[in-house]
């Protein structure tokens, strides 16, 4: 016969009710940590709990409220609006003798005006705000709200953490699966934990599904590889297409390419694609890497990156992903230079600081008689008619910027040759200047 407990999800039944049952986050909840001491003493302060799904944000908020003997009002930023916040505040004011905690799940979902609605009530102490978010608060929450709260970063649970949670659920007869006599060999437990990818809720949900499908043999419910294979059909990676993990992984890919590590580059590329990242986005980023971090040290990298982009457009997933992988490996192994990147930034800063300086007359086009009469294009020297294809002594910058340099090629790859050629041209300019000075 089914009990009422059987209709409650295992993850809910096994939710810790006190700090002693809470698994993980020892950097916050160690006995010598400020947050642990504050919770134990029942001291409340507004906070943002930032961490990945299944890391314990909601559970921790409930434990904090229970320890403080506070009323709890819970809303989801995805569904609630300013009116819901006002209703919570009104109820809190009617219960002034008892602290009110407003727990806001997915708090990053509130826009600026909704976030501002909290501020006066947090400042007056009418409510204590505990917001939970999977997104970086510095990007998603306004400064006024952040300045009135403390941000606590919850880490992804380790495999050891999840094993502890799983084994507790298997052993617990009151809230868990202890009465079912479920037998899961150690290697299969680790497969479940690895599949859950740091998410305690996901781990327990998987365990519950496995328990439901397990077949009884002589009074025991045995789990084998076949059952695990059926349940664990598709990985759920720690990834959000526009969340913190997304940008972390893109950053890791870019830095691995820049650091000339093809193996790490392939790993992070695979993580992104496995997590559902748009391959076109990755292809665009690889083009950026080819320009920013390789540049003229190996111009073939840019062409290969563009070819990979086009190849993916033609082939799609999954065949076209190999072309992106090829470009990533080439870029990781190519000679590196950020000289063009730095030069372009320097030139852009110059333009912003100096404004619209005039183009020298001899560099201007003169398609009409009037322009020619105004000396447009006068004394311009056509470089192809000069020795070495270089018009020594000609200045191409505005007069006030003559002599300014932005591009400094380095001693790697093709830029070695570029550097030699530019040094040769500078010597020709110096010789021309010396010759002109001697004439005067």
From Swiss-Prot:
Matching entries from InterPro entries are given as: AAA+_ATPase, AAA_assoc_2, AAA_ATPase_RarA/MGS1/WRNIP1, ATPase_AAA_core, DNA_pol3_clamp-load_cplx_C, MgsA_C, P-loop_NTPase
A single MF term (Gene Ontology): enzyme activator activity
Give an example GO biological process.
DNA-templated DNA replication
Binding positions for ATP?
51-58
Record key words, sorted: ATP-binding, DNA replication, Nucleotide-binding
ATP-binding is among the record's keywords: yes
Please give the superkingdom of this protein's source: Bacteria
Q: Does the record bear ATP-binding in its keywords?
A: yes
The record's comment on protein family reads:
Belongs to the AAA ATPase family. RarA/MGS1/WRNIP1 subfamily.
* Known role: DNA-dependent ATPase that plays important roles in cellular responses to stalled DNA replication processes.
* Name of protein: Replication-associated recombination protein A
